[in-house]
């Protein structure tokens, strides 16, 4: 059975606690509704050897796009390998690291929704300030009904991560503490 649209979730990698929490949100909060609307979700990363689907128990596919072809197609920001947190790891991001983004595209290639982060110090290098999954689904429902969608979304932040994904929050806190040593 073919889908009417695809939700493409671009993420940095399985090492990123923000990405893990976000993928879990799509799996737990959006997958059923997206399927009801005759759509599908696919995660896209440029991390070679990514294990997110297996490690997180995701019920949607993960596509490894080490050339960043999909990211370039949609204008999703790509951090050069030398500037990635894993710059010293051989073969992990040979062509740079895709940053978080969401593209919802119909079967004819029409973009129904797009959001992409621009990494900065204020959003922890592209990790935080993602639109909440429930807001994306709500916006998609409006679009599919032919209504205009507002683009004001609540966004992920440290408080959100702490309350919704406490284990991932601890990883971020440990990373921040390591930077302050």
Show where each model-derived region lies.
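Short active-site neighborhood of thiol/selenol oxidoreductases, capturing the structured segment around
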Residues: 1-26, 40
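A short local loop/turn or secondary-structure capping micro-motif enriched for an aromatic residue
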Residues: 2-3, 81, 120-123
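Short, internal strand/loop/helix patches
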Residues: 53-99
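Short, glycine/serine-rich, charged loops/turns that create anion-binding
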Residues: 14, 48, 119
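Thiol-/selenol-based redox modules, centered on thioredoxin-like
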Residues: 89-181
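Structural microenvironment flanking redox-active thiols in thiol-disulfide oxidoreductases
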Residues: 21-72
